[in-house]
A protein has these predicted regions:
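SDR active-site lid
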Residues: 171-235
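Active-site helix of classical SDR
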Residues: 118, 154
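Substrate-binding pocket helix/loop in short-chain dehydrogenase/reductase
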Residues: 94-95, 99-104
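Conserved glycine-rich Rossmann-like NAD(P)H-binding loop of the short-chain dehydrogenase/reductase
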Residues: 24-41
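Rossmann-fold cofactor-recognition segment
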Residues: 48-63
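Residue(s) in the substrate-gating loop at a strand-loop-helix junction
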Residues: 138
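Conserved glycine-rich cofactor-binding loop
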Residues: 10-11
Length: 261
């Protein structure tokens, strides 16, 4: 059974994927900044059949210890088969109301953290014969989305880095899956950064009516097992990805009409 490390594992997509891998008998390393919620997910995974579960707490707003975190995750079971870099934070502010500090925080958590982990694990993965890195991007990383300027920027950046990584390391046994969710019913909007850096504190209507995390996890875990380069996760909102590709002008007009909160 695979050894799997999931960041952002205390709720939503990360927790649902952890439970799905647990049902396969996987060995799991789970990371989040919330000890209580993470321990709850770990207990659920053990009950659902995980061979072993290790919990590693980490706050991705401070990356000074991230190399040590990656080393601990790797050493937990003597190597990792799958790394799912899922931790992230969103926002609900206009460009004018988004401070540079807020943008930097989102870039640290959403972009630099997964980049740093991937870089730390590349050499041991290659030496071991390969491995699989999945990373959560977003539909907001495929086109500009109102009230998401910093969030969209961080997710656009993930595409550039991880597509490059795949091109460079494919022949050395590294596989990359870009996980692109649309509206999934998680707490991402509740914990999103609002004006002044405070929590948004409520579920967006679109988010609340989105796909369940369990359905999303089923799609994601299957895509990783098939080494899919990219997997779109959601419902009709994913049409915007294809509209952007084939009708960019129409996509821009539709984006201006989106009311995300």
């Amino acid at each position: 059974m695979p050894c799997v490390w999931i960041t952002g594992a205390s709720s939503g997509i990360g927790a649902a994927c952890a439970c799905r891998y647990a049902a396969q008998g996987a060995r799991l390393v789970l990371t989040s900044s919330s000890q209580e919620r993470l321990e709850g997910v770990a207990a659920q995974c053990r009950a659902q059949g995980a061979a072993e579960v290790v919990v590693l707490l980490f706050d991705f707003r401070d990356l000074s210890g991230i190399d040590a975190l990656a080393r601990r995750a790797w050493e937990a079971f003597g190597g990792l088969d799958i790394v799912f870099l899922n931790a992230g934070v969103s926002q609900r502010t206009t460009v004018e109301d988004t401070s540079l500090e807020m943008v930097r925080e989102m870039m640290e958590i959403n972009y630099f953290a997964p980049v740093a982990i991937a870089k730390a694990l590349l050499a041991p993965m290659v030496a071991r014969g390969g491995g699989h890195i999945a990373v959560t991007t977003s539909i907001a990383g495929r086109f500009g989305f109102p009230l998401r300027c910093g969030y969209s920027s961080s997710k656009f950046a993930l595409y550039g880095f991880f597509e490059t990584l795949q091109a460079e390391y494919y022949d050395r046994g590294i596989r990359v899956t870009l996980v692109c969710p649309g509206r999934v019913r998680t707490n991402i909007s509740f914990y999103a950064l609002d004006k002044g850096g405070q929590r948004h504190g409520k579920m967006d209507p679109g988010q609340g009516g989105g796909m369940s995390p369990e359905d999303a996890a089923r799609i994601i875990v299957h895509a990783i097992s098939r080494s899919r380069r990219e997997v779109l996760v959601g419902r009709k909102e994913l049409l915007m990805v294809y509209i952007k590709r084939f009708f960019p002008g129409l996509c821009a007009r539709l984006a201006r009409r989106i009311r995300p909160v």
